[in-house]
Amino acid sequence: VLIITIIVVIILAAAVILTISKNNPVSSAKEAAFKEDIRSFQTELSLYVGKQMTVDYYGNREKITVIDNLDDMDKYISGYNKKKYSDKLGIEDDELVYFPDKVTKDEKKWLDDLGIKPYSVYIPEAGEDCFIWNGNAITGYYDEKLKEFLSTTNGVLKIPKRCTEISYISFENVSYIENVITQDGLLNVSSKSFRNCANLKSVYISKSVRYISDEWVFYGCSNLVSIEVDSENECYSSQDGVLYNKEKTTLIAAPGKIEECNVPSTVKTIGKNAFSLCKNLKKVVLLDGLESIGARAFEHCTSLSEVKLPNTLKKVDIDAFYSANITGELVIPDSVESIENSSFLYCTNISKVVIGSNLKTISGTSSIDYYNSFRACSNLKEFVVKQDNKYFSSQDGILYNKDKTKLILAPSAYEVNDLYIPNSVKEIGDYSFYGSTNVKGKIYLPEGLISIGWQSFSQCGISGEVNIPSSVTSIKSSSFFNAEYITKINVDSNNLNYSSQDGILYNKDKTELIIAPHKLTINNLTLPDSLKVIDGMAFDSCQNITGTLTLNDNLETIKDRAFYCCSGISGTVVMPESVKKVEGGIFDSCVGIQNIKCRASSKPDGWDDDWNMYCNANVVWGYTGD
């Protein structure tokens, strides 16, 4: 009788549940979705009992538990009975089962209708639907939802407890966030997470955070006043609103609105980007004990006028003080061994640099390039190197290597009438007199000079004729680029590598035309019969070349913008049939050229499509005349 009674009760209960499901379309739909999708979802994956992964579950990024053996379901469902649930769900023992780790209140009801009790119930925090989730990582936000939600919290963004990571650029450029509070559970804050949040004022870092990127997390947060860290955090700390590692040996990030900072004596490293774009920073005190200043640490600190580097400092990294407002004399202490690329680039108010006795490298190598640490310091007049430095020296304010065989850099504001390069110099470095407009008069190059570097005299003030000694074996094509007062380049007839004709620089056999000086004055220019290649920008802005241009019949290649802005060339230019390669814009802005007559019947394959870009001349193909 008891057995019969139990069977009747079970049948009646099943009938009631079935009736409820049929009469409740929401419940019925949920049940159907559960019964079908839970068996077929992602079945192509090879997964194991209890393995967790992030998937798109019912349209939401959720964590689910994969079960491939019904015997293990009791780990996830209380009161589990294998036969009862396998029959109810219509699943076989060898089929994968997907069961949500966490469910909402609504989902819990239909699971209860099926007689299934999840081992945990997840109730979302207010505002969770404002974020784009990847599992438990926030990867972005829904703009209108977040804006509406923050309007109810006075701009306070409280990161949900569920969140373990704030991903790359998650909240970049969000102007309506004013305060950020992280909660226990958050582990990682990725690069650029809050970059350019212009109205962000404060940030609270919870005790659970283990990693904060040093790549512009709070860059451009110009109104940020304070970064505070929970005192129980094991990895990070804060002092006066500045973020440090726990031991305060590394200064990680300063708030964008900071005006003064007394760096603790415990700090050995100013981290990269630490004060980057802190435009209100007027004073920073660096104490002995500091050993390195990271890349871009004080970049664009445009109010920072005075910096005293401590006597323990060893390295100044890339762009460390790029475009800072350092004024007057800069002393590099004896302890400093390395100054990397662009460290003081565009520090336009430095007037003098004193280099200590142990500096070994500038710009990361023994040579100086375009990213020279002191280039474009427009008011820099003098380098002074201590005599006991083994790697560098100075003379008349110019920086050399130790034995003065290489001229490294003239300060941007260096002044001289008639420039005499010392007889010891074998190499004039890249960009060495770049932009030195106060270097005027003639330049005298010594016999024994071997090489002249990239743009070494570009945009400088030297004038008249330049005489190249017989000893020179290397001249970069841009060495005299935009040196607008040079009238001629003459090469010693005994030089084995170069030659000149009509003030134009060629290789020795005149098969390559390298450069014509800006102030070259010629009427009706005819190029030599031997010429095969005209280098790029060779006649750039040579506006004193007037009349016609005659190209020789052996010419093969004209490189990019070769005759750029030669506005004095006029009439008709005939392109020989021998020309097989033409790069872009060779007659760009040559407003006087009216016709370009090409011997070729159509554009050769080796001619760029934009070969006559920004030239309004009429082009004729298949020209057979004189």
Labelled PLM ranges:
Residues 50-121:
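Extracellular/periplasmic head regions of type IV pilus-like filament subunits
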Residues 26-58:
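Membrane-proximal N-terminal amphipathic helix
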Residues 22, 31, 309:
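Phosphate-coordinating loops and pocket residues in cytosolic domains that bind phosphorylated ligands
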Residues 168-170, 191-193, 215-217, 271-274, ...:
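Consensus positions within tandem repeat domains that build extended binding/scaffold surfaces
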Residues 216, 370-372, 606-616:
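Short, aromatic/basic amphipathic alpha-helical patches
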Residues 121-131, 136, 150-165, 174-188, ...:
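Structural signature of tandem-repeat unit edges
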Residues 1-20:
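N-terminal single-pass transmembrane signal-anchor helix
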Residues 367-368, 375:
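A structural signal for leucine-rich repeat
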